[in-house]
Curated annotation (Swiss-Prot):
Family, as annotated: Belongs to the universal ribosomal protein uS3 family.
Function, as annotated: Binds the lower part of the 30S subunit head. Binds mRNA in the 70S ribosome, positioning it for translation.
Protein name: Small ribosomal subunit protein uS3
Biased composition regions of type Low complexity, renumbered to the chain: 241-267
Gene3D superfamilies linked: 3.30.300.20, Ribosomal protein S3, C-terminal domain (3.30.1140.32)
Domain KH type-2 as annotated: residue spans: 43-111
Gene name, Swiss-Prot/TrEMBL: rpsC
């Protein structure tokens, strides 16, 4: 009991969108679905390692036939871009070597870092690495998030807190954090702090309010209108059983209409 599902995966397709936008049904080596999944994971790991101090919130990957588009959302775009774009060019060259395709690198700035759960988790982890008391780091993150307009925040730390011999978990919550409400806009972030006592896991949930009725219906309409999705322009499958009865019933409905004029001519 008490196990928490990832809020991002739980609301995927409802209030959250995919962060890898592509599809592959090829059997060719290097272009298979599993190859792209592994490549996406490698891209995210390399970016997180190289841009650890840049405050990367999320990375969105979109693929076409001959190009890979990588969108980096960061709180410190100056570190990612570098002097005269040198750092961005280095990152792009590294991604092109990894993927073997042309890479389009886009850098977006996160306007309010206090409301981004991933950035809040990274901030707490940095303070723990710098030997700041964990309760003080949690309290400061809560206050900053609530001042920025959050409806609620929940922070959980797990590990050897304060250098204790036995590991434990502590969490603080302020406001409302409805994890079971699908329309709730909840941002989730996780980061590990590397301290002298070991690693401390930091989890952050931030509640930003509920999605309105009009926004919810609009997003559902966009999901249903996608080609190849249910409710959209979907082609019938081969051997579809539902189409067979309709084809069999069609001639039966036309037969009485043809017999009616023949009965009138006899009279």
């Amino acid at each position: 009991m008490g196990q928490k599902i990832n809020p991002f995966g739980y609301r995927l397709g409802i209030t959250e969108n995919h962060r890898s936008k592509w599809f592959s049904d090829s059997n060719k080596a290097g272009e298979r679905y599993r190859d792209f999944v592994l490549e996406d994971d490698q891209i995210r790991k390399e970016m997180s390692k190289d841009l650890e101090r840049a405050g990367v919130s999320r990375i969105v990957i979109e693929r076409t036939r001959d190009r890979v588009r990588v969108d980096i959302h960061t709180a410190r775009p100056g570190i990612v871009i570098g002097r005269r774009g040198a750092e961005a060019e280095r990152v792009r060259a590294k991604l092109e070597k990894l993927t073997g395709k042309q890479v389009q690198l886009n850098i977006f700035e996160v306007k309010n870092a206090a409301l981004d759960a991933q950035l809040v988790a990274q901030g707490i982890a940095e303070q723990l690495t710098n030997r700041v008391t964990f309760r003080r780091a949690m309290r400061k993150a809560q206050q900053d998030a609530m001042r920025a307009g959050a409806k609620g925040i929940r922070i959980k730390l797990s590990g050897r807190l304060g250098g204790a011999e036995m590991s434990r978990s502590e969490f603080y919550r302020e406001g409302r954090v409805p994890l079971q409400t699908l329309r709730a806009l909840i941002d989730y972030g996780f980061f590990e702090a590397k301290t002298t006592y070991g690693r401390i896991g930091v989890k952050v949930w931030i509640y930003k309010g509920d999605m309105t009725e009009s926004e919810f219906e609009e997003q559902q309409a966009q999901q249903n209108n996608r080609p190849g999705r249910r409710g959209g322009d979907r082609r019938p499958r081969r051997g579809n059983r539902s189409a067979a009865p309709q084809a069999a019933e069609a001639p039966k409905a036309e037969a009485p209409a043809e017999a009616a004029p023949a009965a009138e001519t006899k009279e």
